[in-house]
Amino acid sequence: MNTPTATLNAPAADAESAAASAADKKAAFELNKLSKRLHRQVGQAITDFNMIQEGDRVMVCLSGGKDSYGMLDILLGLQQRAPITFSIVAVNLDQKQPGFPEHILPAYLKARGVEFHIENQDTYSIVKRVIPEGKTMCSLCSRLRRGILYRVADELGATKIALGHHRDDFLGTVFLNMFFGSKLKGMPPKLVSDDGRHTVIRPLAYVAETDLERWAEHRAFPIIPCTLCGTQDNLQRVQIKHMLRDWDQRFPGRIDNMHRAFSQVVPSHLMDRALFPFETLVPTGVADPAGDRAFDEDDSELCAPSGSADAAGDEVSVPVALIRRV
């Protein structure tokens, strides 16, 4: 027999249950969108840059971080539905860092049924011996890893080496090179290695780091933190990462626009004489519909204050039409 209290509490319980059900449906919907977006972006990058071809053996470099786990997971999904046939072998370089949990990756890869190879090389001792305390280890560590991975690729018969750099890594590299190297240089989605023998691909070129974080949480990857360099909070790359995250939060769309700019480069509007023949440029006296203009049609829109926090408060926009009449 229902008591009066139970009868009164029933509507509240039903409301809570309905709210929980709605929240679960929304979460499932968002995860489905995330999955589709990740697979679409990786598939698009592979297509745009012809990263993987029929019969390729792709060596997926797996560090144990969210990015490489995500890359492997997405590539395995695409492998099942791709119109071409390619194989995957996951490779981890065990650098003998103290406390590195050697059992995690083999257990995960066996459970997924993925072919894998663990390469044991004590690069940790070399880096610690050569690099002074407090100095950045990334450069030497990267060179050592690269040489080892190239050798392993040969031994395994891999035709492609896949690295887990994402969209934010691309942007961060551009700013690092500008701020500290005086170069306008990013991170190519596909390249031939410096020894001329290997093709390196970055299938996550279009993927945002925040999406990889959400995917890693959803898939419950057994993340292995990098104790060698990941705790060096003063790294220039970490500072750049914080800058980009701040921009993304304060100015939605800015990061996407900057990333798209990499595929819309106009060499004639830069200053590299190796890319454009400024020295030999002379007027021909003949109008060219495809020719260059000093001012683009939408320059006025780019310069005009928009009223947003991103606009320059004291700048005044001058219509392009007026400038052309001067």
From Swiss-Prot:
GO CC annotations on file: cytoplasm
Keyword terms of this UniProt record: 4Fe-4S, ATP-binding, Cytoplasm, Iron, Iron-sulfur, Magnesium, Metal-binding, Nucleotide-binding, RNA-binding, Transferase, tRNA processing, tRNA-binding
Magnesium listed as a keyword: yes
Keyword RNA-binding tagged: yes
Record-linked CDD domains: TtcA-like
Disulphide bonds in the chain: none
Catalytic activity as recorded in UniProt: cytidine(32) in tRNA + S-sulfanyl-L-cysteinyl-[cysteine desulfurase] + AH2 + ATP = 2-thiocytidine(32) in tRNA + L-cysteinyl-[cysteine desulfurase] + A + AMP + diphosphate + H(+)
Family the UniProt entry places it in: Belongs to the TtcA family.
Misc. remarks from the entry: The thiolation reaction likely consists of two steps: a first activation step by ATP to form an adenylated intermediate of the target base of tRNA, and a second nucleophilic substitution step of the sulfur (S) atom supplied by the hydrosulfide attached to the Fe-S cluster.
Protein name: tRNA-cytidine(32) 2-sulfurtransferase
The species this protein was found in: Leptothrix cholodnii (strain ATCC 51168 / LMG 8142 / SP-6)
